Swiss-Prot record:
Residues 17-34, 82-85 form a propeptide. Belongs to the neurotoxin 03 (Tx2) family. 05 subfamily. Keywords: Disulfide bond, Ion channel impairing toxin, Ionotropic glutamate receptor inhibitor, Knottin, Neurotoxin, Postsynaptic neurotoxin, Secreted, Signal, Toxin, Voltage-gated sodium channel impairing toxin. This is U1-ctenitoxin-Pn1a. The lineage of its organism: Eukaryota, Metazoa, Ecdysozoa, Arthropoda, Chelicerata. Insecticidal neurotoxin that reversibly inhibits the N-methyl-D-aspartate (NMDA)-subtype of ionotropic glutamate receptor (GRIN) and inhibits inactivation of insect sodium channels (Nav). In vivo, is highly toxic to insects. It is found in: Secreted. GO terms for cellular component: extracellular region; host cell postsynaptic membrane. The presence of a 'disulfide through disulfide knot' structurally defines this protein as a knottin. Expressed by the venom gland. Disulfide bonds join 35-49, 42-55, 46-81, 48-65, 57-63. It comes from the Eukaryota. Transmembrane segments: none annotated.
Length: 85
């Protein structure tokens, strides 16, 4: 019985990892290049990837994408960005 449970668990894990890999192939690099990751230069919050990442210009002369201290508020602001996540 234990062997069957372990076998089924491995089978489910194999199918899950295959579907995740297929989802990654659906989004080309050009689509993910529309927004910047953490520490990427930015001009507005919409230039940064992720719902909790904001464009921070307070601590230096150049603006960079940083993790927001208020992720819920940032997610609401990001909802109004056009074609960027």
């Amino acid at each position: 019985m234990k062997v069957a449970i372990v076998f089924l668990s491995l089978l489910v894990l194999a199918f899950a990892s295959e579907s995740i890999e297929e989802n990654r192939e659906e989004f080309p690099v050009e689509e993910s290049a529309r927004c910047g990751d953490i520490n990427a230069p930015c001009q507005s919050d919409c230039d940064c990837c992720g719902y909790s990442v904001t464009c921070d210009c307070y601590w230096s002369s150049s603006c960079k994408c940083r993790e927001s201290l208020f992720p819920l508020g940032m997610a609401l602001r990001k909802a109004f960005c056009q074609n960027k996540i």
